[in-house]
């Protein structure tokens, strides 16, 4: 074993962090893995079952879950490894970014990968996954553009019509934007459309 490999292994064993991640394969996982995690009384997020992932050759990967465990204080690699061994999961790694990892669980930022659904995540211990998945500024602008195009295509002249549509058909993207921070610009756009059609 080379000196570099030994150093890397030692560094991993000596690492400490609050947020850790690992992969769990259902075919080899402990039967009661979810109950085991719940009994730890920690915050965690389990991805939807990744059953549509492909490798670079286009072959299907083995079904798996990405799991993020979160602690209030630092935990060592050895402490987390006890958990992954109990679950029969992969070796743990420190999560570089909680937000980035949760977005990756759904493949939100990779247009070439299958998109998994937020509703299929398992969230435990009060994790605010909606906050972690909050739209970026670029995402918001794209959705506002979508709404404006929809307003023009449908000839919408009342804000209520758009809100009703968003509530029924675009609850996960348009509706939160309209409720939280984009209503003013959209209302002004609809109002100007109405004045234009009245002339």
Curated annotation (Swiss-Prot):
This is Replication protein. Is essential for plasmid replication. Nicks the positive strand at the plus origin of replication. Pfam families: Rep_OBD, RepB_C. It comes from Staphylococcus aureus. Belongs to the Gram-positive plasmids replication protein type 2 family. GO terms for biological process: DNA replication. Signal peptide: none annotated. GO terms for molecular function: DNA binding; DNA topoisomerase activity. InterPro entries: Plasmid_rep_OBD, RepB_C.
């Amino acid at each position: 074993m080379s000196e570099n490999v030994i150093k890397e292994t030692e560094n991993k064993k000596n690492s400490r962090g609050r947020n850790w991640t690992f992969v769990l394969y259902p075919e080899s996982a402990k039967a009661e893995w979810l109950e085991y995690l719940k009994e730890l009384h920690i915050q965690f997020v389990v991805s939807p079952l990744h059953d549509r992932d492909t490798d670079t050759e286009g072959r299907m990967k083995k079904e798996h879950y990405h799991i993020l465990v979160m602690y209030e204080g630092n935990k060592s690699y050895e402490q987390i490894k006890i958990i992954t061994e109990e679950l029969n999961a992969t070796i743990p790694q420190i999560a570089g970014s909680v937000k980035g990892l949760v977005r990756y669980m759904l493949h939100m930022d990779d247009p070439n990968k299958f998109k998994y659904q937020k509703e299929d995540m398992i969230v435990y211990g009060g994790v605010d996954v909606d906050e972690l998945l909050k739209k970026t500024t670029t995402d918001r602008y794209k959705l506002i553009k979508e709404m404006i195009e929809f307003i023009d295509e449908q000839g919408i002249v009342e804000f209520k019509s758009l809100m009703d549509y968003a509530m029924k058909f675009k609850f996960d993207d348009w509706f939160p934007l309209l409720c939280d921070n984009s209503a003013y610009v959209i209302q002004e756009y609809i109002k100007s459309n109405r004045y234009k059609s009245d002339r």
